[in-house]
């Protein structure tokens, strides 16, 4: 059926900020879909609150609204734009929930807007646990025995009839939020109570646990003519019981017989047909390893994390085709863009193995609960492609960037057998490494399979890796063993370690004997048809399919997996850099390992290498492609860390040179540079051990800010107020050494702001200054940033511009740089300089209309700012106010403290823009799901040093009609200054403490600050946790609370007697 002509204008809903469970895969899907609809001639309107995405660029849709994805704002845009149809299936759970809400509130009927892709009834059937159960029974598809409950007591009663363990799944939540596995009644009560609160319909499904079954996923497509096909099946390494987003996954599935595959394939196709989904859909099934029994676990009636993985694993562009199907085209009418000759009705065939490993945030959250279960915890993932399981698994391990280059963590050798086996059985994020260690200790695959229910097939592969390690150890410099190791994905570094030599020597030996990788094409059809995709992976074999072109090329390094501190913002910069390289007439080559992102979409660059970002893997591509040079400044710390080894190997680094990158990163060189440029910085010193640190701090005076050099996202950074805390930090938080000194700086409590600048070596363009709402001490990635600045004097702004120019020229910056300043008493100090693109590039690019990464790339390739039409200095500021606000994923991470400090904790961001500061703030808070009603109670629990300031906030809250509650000390302080607050207990006062008030819904906001001694704050942590679990707005910085107050004051009415 040809495409529909009765609709002209389509609105697409994006997925909003990045949180755990909903990451960059939706930027990829949304970008694909918008371009796909425009290609068919429709007018596209996009709504998304996340500025750090490619999809919110002006050229992706005809009209782009960066506004909160809430009923209030989406309705406004619908009424203004009057689209004919709405496509919600590309915005993740956010998009689906928004569509449901618009429908329930009658907005879609009122404006006669049609839903495309998935009908509401299908969303309901797939998402509502009761309707799903009915549908499966009608289709005679088996599902685990289960019961829908609305109260904790109902849950306990049902569990008693089927027996433990049981699984709790809240309805309409994302990434398993609030769910979990319960082994007994105590756990069941706890998890159900929390799950009911987090479910928007206060409903949970309690089901029999089928933990230990194989977890298999099918990614299916269907069109309006009822053509349906399987794009790809995937098998989890971890059995059922661990969220698929936290599991290691292989595609295609490896351990099923043909009969089992056909059985599950038929089930998946019958489900998508019954739901009448037009587009993509993901079906998760559990297969009993010992019989042909299977259960349907769940269905996602939308494009998901797994579809991004399936798209990248097969090359089959699911989101692009889902958008075309949504407007009436059928699979037998659309050409598969990969081959350019076959139709999309072909099921992809793979002649390789893909491995996906999740990336977890526990390097940032040392206290976080690492046990894996049905609630997702990973922030991102890596994917690797190889010709066998060993190769793809080991390539994925070294893509993770957790300091490993093989499936082993050396420290585990010291773990006792008992502790090892406990970790093997009770899965945490690093289970793969524990299982590998167990095999190295001689546990057999059979024994481990019995303990873990991991298929013996995979454990045999881990055993094979260990056997090759032993071969290598026994035969140093043996070329045959070297070839075997390379065929199985071993890195030069691992081989060097086993041979007692250096990586360089192994590389030399390989090159001399022509043991080099070949690059194979990902073509969706196992080389059956000719293909034109420039999408490659490396393997050791024969016939290289990646042919170097005659055009001069530039290699751009991506930023790897998404993690806290290095998010989708860097992918945004990478994609823009590629556009500029192409515009300058070069061939653009991308190298990256993240399957969720736009940069790994093969249609973005001229060539895509899906490879780990390590020195060895990058050099292999450089040896083949011989590019003009490599651009490292857009790939975050990942790419910057590769600059030095690459330069040593004779590779041309384009943009700021390695020596100058060093001057910004190395403390002593940086101080030297600032002295020469006559720019003040807070007094500080470096220390290589505990005594030196204590001495430095005495000299500078407390409080001090301590941190390791060379890190991103403020890892292991702390503000310490006394020597005792400092010594404990030096002992536990860092491994200080002469090679890795610790920086000790005077901590200045002032106004913080930051600048992104672009330099061509002579002139410096400063697109804008962003002022932070939270004062210094909260990581810049967790602060709310305002552009243009609201409180900085003209003089301070001029000083900032002057220092920025001096630094850019003095440090020989070519391209992008980011500088952070702190201002106290009108004096400007430089805190740090990053000679690369930073996480504020997308936000600032959007609000100033300067495509910063593109401009920077053109300068790197030799153009000047004046040639591009930009003037030197600070760019004229916008008349509107724009705010970038952080978004956190604390609900997903048990035991992680939500207190903000110098170590970054946010996973994503939103933007609010309007004519005034208050309106922009309102939008930013709404978009980041911090909604405060206009009346209610606010509770204060405040450290001594901030009580004075909190008193003023409390008075203002009272003036707009809020009730004030406070803990004992705070209430006494308020009372002594004439403000009566209702006292509440901290913790343990049964019905009168803060958590119980929170549970009863009597508190609308919590303002909690922490004093200088952070250790004694367990009560505070429990209070903060209760706020997170019940969705009560929590402010741990008074500046954020003050910003929220401004919003409330601007919306409140004055009530006065005449």
From Swiss-Prot:
Record: residues binding ATP 2: 707, 746, 748, 752, 777-780, 820, 832
Gene designation per UniProt: carB
Pathway: Amino-acid biosynthesis; L-arginine biosynthesis; carbamoyl phosphate from bicarbonate: step 1/1; Pyrimidine metabolism; UMP biosynthesis via de novo pathway; (S)-dihydroorotate from bicarbonate: step 1/3
Region entry Oligomerization domain, spans: 402-546
Renumbered residue ranges of the record's region Allosteric domain: 930-1058
Single GO BP term: 'de novo' UMP biosynthetic process
Stored SUPFAM superfamilies: Carbamoyl phosphate synthetase, large subunit connection domain, Glutathione synthetase ATP-binding domain-like, Methylglyoxal synthase-like, PreATP-grasp domain
One GO molecular-function entry: carbamoyl-phosphate synthase (glutamine-hydrolyzing) activity
The name this protein goes by in its record: Carbamoyl phosphate synthase large chain
Binding residue positions for Mg(2+) 3: 820, 832
Binding-site positions, Mg(2+) 4: 832, 834
Residue ranges annotated for the MGS-like domain, each copy included: 930-1058
Enzyme class: ligase
Family membership noted in the UniProt record: Belongs to the CarB family.
Domain of life (superkingdom): Bacteria
Entries under PROSITE patterns matching the protein: ATP_GRASP (PS50975), CPSASE_1 (PS00866), CPSASE_2 (PS00867), MGS (PS51855)
Catalysis performed (reactions): hydrogencarbonate + L-glutamine + 2 ATP + H2O = carbamoyl phosphate + L-glutamate + 2 ADP + phosphate + 2 H(+)
